[in-house]
Amino acid sequence: MSVTMREMLEAGCHFGHQTRFWNPKMAPFIFGHRNKIHIINLEKTLPMFQDAMKYVRQLAANRGTILFVGTKRQSREILAEEAGRAGMPYVDARWLGGMLTNFKTVKTSIKRLKDMEAAKEAGALETMSKKEALMFEREMLKLEKSIGGIKDMGGVPDAIFVVDVGYHKIAVTEANKLGVPVIGVVDTNHSPEGIDYVIPGNDDSSKAVALYVRGVADAILEGRANAVQEVVEAARGGDDEFVEVQEG
């Protein structure tokens, strides 16, 4: 589903930060200012957003994994929801240092969480004392909160999508270090450096955040659907091209 300029305006994607907090590297994407607030040029944002979505579609069509990152209060819920809809991993609580660069260690925690889930399913809590069961539940809850969204990721993702690149600087740095492409919403108070697909826009409004996140989830689902369609058409095409030659 394509996003329009009107939708971006209605979601407030054009509202940047206070002019005194600006990052000069965002100057090419700033239209001007009103009441000491920078206004982002949506004529720049829209094509850049479309370009990012094109990349997302291609990646999804090739069965790539995109990790959604958004741990701020206004993005947590919608991010987890939309990543789930797209069948992608996500980080909606604190970013743990080394989540990408030290994935081996993270894998150990994922295994622990999965083992605990399996044990609970098998009725292990019933054999524990009240105190043991409480400790078990507490640990499991803590693990679920920090790594529940990435427990099925399997390895380093093919790309990461970040809402508010300044707030998630560690995630961006880790992705850059590993050469993992970054799709990022960049507000007027942050730098677009290190972001492969820059989406200049408001990263604080829950309406704006919902628009970006839904857009990425839609692009993933479209990419997958297109890939399936191509396989079906290729199979059909193969049937059409086969012509039996009569002998004699």
UniProtKB/Swiss-Prot annotation:
Pfam families: Ribosomal_S2. Keywords: Ribonucleoprotein, Ribosomal protein. It comes from the Bacteria. It comes from Cupriavidus necator (strain ATCC 17699 / DSM 428 / KCTC 22496 / NCIMB 10442 / H16 / Stanier 337). InterPro entries: Ribosomal_uS2 (IPR001865), Ribosomal_uS2_bac/mit/plastid (IPR005706), Ribosomal_uS2_flav_dom_sf (IPR023591). One of its GO terms (biological process) is translation. GO terms for molecular function: structural constituent of ribosome. NCBIfam families: rpsB_bact. Coiled coil: none annotated. Signal peptide: none annotated. The gene is rpsB. The lineage of its organism: Bacteria, Pseudomonadati, Pseudomonadota, Betaproteobacteria, Burkholderiales. This is Small ribosomal subunit protein uS2. GO terms for cellular component: cytosolic small ribosomal subunit. Belongs to the universal ribosomal protein uS2 family.
